[in-house]
């Protein structure tokens, strides 16, 4: 199988590339860097490109059997008007350009990144793929992002909108930001700590994406998260126990809002997501609970 990974130089893209190559697949990865940050491999091609703009990179899509789109500006920044525009455009415009380039006669599958932020903050409500979208900024972006991807269905392409939980792994993602306070003995819950945290280990995420390529019944929105979401305060206790650090110093919600601005709404939001479709398709998790995930990441 030949897989085209848009955004292949990022945290998730590098992991997925490695796993696909290990299984004997061919990979074409794109990114904005001048060189791909992995060792040269005979079945790996790299295209440097800005996918928000049309260009020759679209021609290289023609040979792929499946396309994985991971492109998107990180949400971890000050949400100025300009930054929010970058968050939106990097996702929706890139997806539009990719879908426009797909050929129904060739590509059978588009896995397009989305996020559990699609649901907004819904408290203790259990959220499977049929749950409604949120009305906040990330919910709005998620709807636009997925709508752009689902245009591919008009070409007869199987489209999977991969609603990622927070991705945990040793080499990137949110882990370093999450662990930083614990290193200084000031780790604690965010706000009241009651908000639900939907997450997934990077290895399970990449395995699930490969699983999707092999299971035709999976289409439309799919929650890519572990089957056991956890409250922020429970996760904090688990991290503290693994690291041998105290966890009794909460960060007040007002302080988070003062420092982070509008981004605080995302950090304090509650999404109790369950991967109904992946579980129904018998996908097996290596790290179904957050303690096993953090013990692997921290080698404890």
Language-model features and meaning:
Residues 215-262, 295-300:
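Mid/C-terminal beta-alpha module of Rossmann-like enzyme folds, strongest
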Residues 114, 147-170:
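Conserved beta-loop-beta element that borders a ligand/cofactor-binding pocket
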Residues 265-300:
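C-terminal amphipathic/interface module of NAD(P)-dependent oxidoreductases
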Residues 3-23:
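N-terminal Rossmann NAD(P)H-binding glycine-rich loop of SDR-like oxidoreductase domains
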Residues 179-187, 195-229:
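Alpha-helical substrate-binding/gating segment
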Residues 143, 155-157, 168-177, 212-222:
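Glycine/proline-rich active-site loop of Rossmann-fold NAD(P)-dependent oxidoreductases
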Residues 96-136:
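Conserved Rossmann-fold NAD(P)-dependent oxidoreductase catalytic core, especially the SDR/UDP-sugar
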Residues 45-94:
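NAD(P)H-binding glycine-rich loop region in Rossmannoid oxidoreductase-like domains
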């Amino acid at each position: 199988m030949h897989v085209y990974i848009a955004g292949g130089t990022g945290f998730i893209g590098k992991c997925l590339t490695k796993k696909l190559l290990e299984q004997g697949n061919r990979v074409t990865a794109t990114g904005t860097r001048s060189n791909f940050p992995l060792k040269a491999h005979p079945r790996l091609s790299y295209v440097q490109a800005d996918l928000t703009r049309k260009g020759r990179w679209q021609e290289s899509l023609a040979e792929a059997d499946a396309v994985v789109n991971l492109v998107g500006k990180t949400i971890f920044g000050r949400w100025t008007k300009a930054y929010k525009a970058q968050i939106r455009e990097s996702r929706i415009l890139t997806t539009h350009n990719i879908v426009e380039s797909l050929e129904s006669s060739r590509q059978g599958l588009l896995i397009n990144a989305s996020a559990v932020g699609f649901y907004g903050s819904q408290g203790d409500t259990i959220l499977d793929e049929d749950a409604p979208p949120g009305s906040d900024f990330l919910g709005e972006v998620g709807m636009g992002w997925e709508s752009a991807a689902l245009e591919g269905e008009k070409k007869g392409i199987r489209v999977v909108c991969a609603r990622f939980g927070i991705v945990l792994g040793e080499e990137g993602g949110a882990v370093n930001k999450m662990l930083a306070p614990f290193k200084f003995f000031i780790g604690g819950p965010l706000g009241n700590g009651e908000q639900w945290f939907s997450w997934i280990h990077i290895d399970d995420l990449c395995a699930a994406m490969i699983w999707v390529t092999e299971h035709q019944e999976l289409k439309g929105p799919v929650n890519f998260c572990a089957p056991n979401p956890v409250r922020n305060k429970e996760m904090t206790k688990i991290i503290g126990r693994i690291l041998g650090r105290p966890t009794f110093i909460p960060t007040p919600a007002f302080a988070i809002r003062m420092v982070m601005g509008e981004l605080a709404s995302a950090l304090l939001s509650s999404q109790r997501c369950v991967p109904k479709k992946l579980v129904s398709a018998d996908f097996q998790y290596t790290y179904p609970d957050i303690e096993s995930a953090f013990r692997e990441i921290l080698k404890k």
